[in-house]
Amino acid sequence: MLPFQAARQRQFARVITFALAGFVFNTTEFIPVALLSDIAQSFAMPVSQTGLIITVYAWVVSLMSLPFMLLTAKAERRGLLIKLLVLFILSHLLSVIAWDFWVLVLARIGVALTHSIFWAITASLVIRVAPKDKKSQAIGLLAIGCSLAMILGLPLGRLIGQFFGWRATFAIIALIAIGILCLFYQLLPHLPSKNAGSLNSLPTLFKRPLLLGLYALTMIIISAHFTAYSYIEPFMLNISTMSHSMATFVLFVFGLSGITASLLFNRYYNAGPIRFILFSMGLLTATLLLLFIASQQTWTMFLLTFFWGIGIAGIGLGLQIRVLHLAPDATDVAMAIYSGIYNIGIGAGALLGNQVMQHYGLAYIGVAGALFAVFGLVLFILVQWKYGHLAPNKLSTEEKKKCG
């Protein structure tokens, strides 16, 4: 094999390792959604209270993403990733042996702390380690890894939880993370911090109206999604009256739609980023609005879940690339803010869904989410109408160099 070919294969192996890490981080972030009823039962708590682990996780990430990013802005990235994975593994082992609910909450806080840095630095790192002519495909592979978390991670985690208990699911996640740690140790080169930004970057970033609008949109639209999605498992069991196995299959379909969204993203995003994001938001709004109606029949629930997944995955892909586009000079700081705001949305959505359940009933979580989504859709249109001329639709060559 020629040295060039060997180097290229090693670069692809690094990208795939990041995609695998994305799979594990996304799986563990959302696995409580699939195990919520089992966790509640094991601690003799109502589901609405157990949902606190989703809210706490999200808010820890939202509060710590930017401070931790700034504290580690100059840290060498390979060593930082290895240290993060050590804490990630130890936190999952604590989840396995958690003797009461609050110990589990503490363990999830540990995982959330690793999350707060991992997603702040990963998008720019995967571009750096990829072959020079395959940087956009590298982001696509990372997105596929995240989508596979929904396709395989959540359904398999749920199945493992059903047969062996929810603790076994966390134990297996820890084992996979050990494998990823070894791969990072073997494959990654020395990675000095690059274009991370600093505290001085904040005033500059906050003078960019398109970026600020994107952050506001992120909080609103993610809140809309998680108002319903945080409680989709009890919704399917109690409102759709599905069996446990059928509910697991619906989660599989939801995840499968993420692959479809990734393919659509690669095909259409560059031709019209704003149109792509608008389409995805419209799809999310429609599916949330129709959630209760679709729940009356199993086949309509499957169909709606598939389109719902395309909508939210398309939004996530589009917004992440848009952040990199609008802040190529401070990618890690901009992504840390994005990750923090995204998780504010998750926590707010889970909390709002909890309140809707308690005051109006589980059946109305979709309608409540749709109202938020409409607000986000209107905000996005207004911001683009007023400030859209300030940014080109495609990354310039110079911006690509800065991102890479």
Swiss-Prot record:
PROSITE patterns: MFS. CDD domains: MFS_NepI_like. GO terms for molecular function: carbohydrate transmembrane transporter activity. It is a multi-pass membrane protein. The chain crosses the membrane at residues 15-35, 51-71, 85-105, 109-129, 137-157, 168-188, 209-229, 245-265, 276-296, 299-319, 333-353, 363-383. It is found in: Cell inner membrane. Keywords: Cell inner membrane, Cell membrane, Membrane, Sugar transport, Transmembrane, Transmembrane helix, Transport. GO terms for cellular component: plasma membrane. Pfam families: MFS_1 (PF07690). Involved in the efflux of sugars. The physiological role may be the reduction of the intracellular concentration of toxic sugars or sugar metabolites. Belongs to the major facilitator superfamily. SotB (TC 2.A.1.2) family. NCBIfam families: PRK03545.1. This is Probable sugar efflux transporter. It comes from Pasteurella multocida (strain Pm70).
